[in-house]
């Protein structure tokens, strides 16, 4: 069976979480200025969102491997420089899927679109959150990206 590697751009990974004790992963962090850090203290998830996303994935696909990039830091905020750098890093790895559980609501420049298209042409599935309100969500609205949207089911 082919191993599946999922790249996650989010708030990092709680390496002490029981789900990841036997999971193969690589990790780094990208600062808002685009600098990369391999220090565990920098990619450790202090927010919980990235760990929650990875936990959902591993629950559905137990043999998955990860390349985790903390592009949000402790503040839970990021910028386009960090996101684009994270995508460039993942482009140079062996990921099969890239998960971005966030949306940018202001139209970015062409570089983000170009990166997503290039990843798609390289047979890498790129998935991103589509916001649940009016307006466009980037990069989910690009044709080369699978937009994922949550919602409430009536009577549940």
Language model: regions and residue ranges:
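Active-site core segment of subtilase-fold serine proteases
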Residues: 1-56, 60, 64
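Generic enzyme active-site microenvironment
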Residues: 8, 68, 129
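Cofactor-binding loop segments of dinucleotide-utilizing enzymes, especially the Rossmann-like FAD-
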Residues: 11, 71, 131
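Active-site donor-binding loop signature of nucleotide-sugar glycosyltransferases
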Residues: 30, 71, 150
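Subtilisin-like peptidase catalytic core
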Residues: 39-104
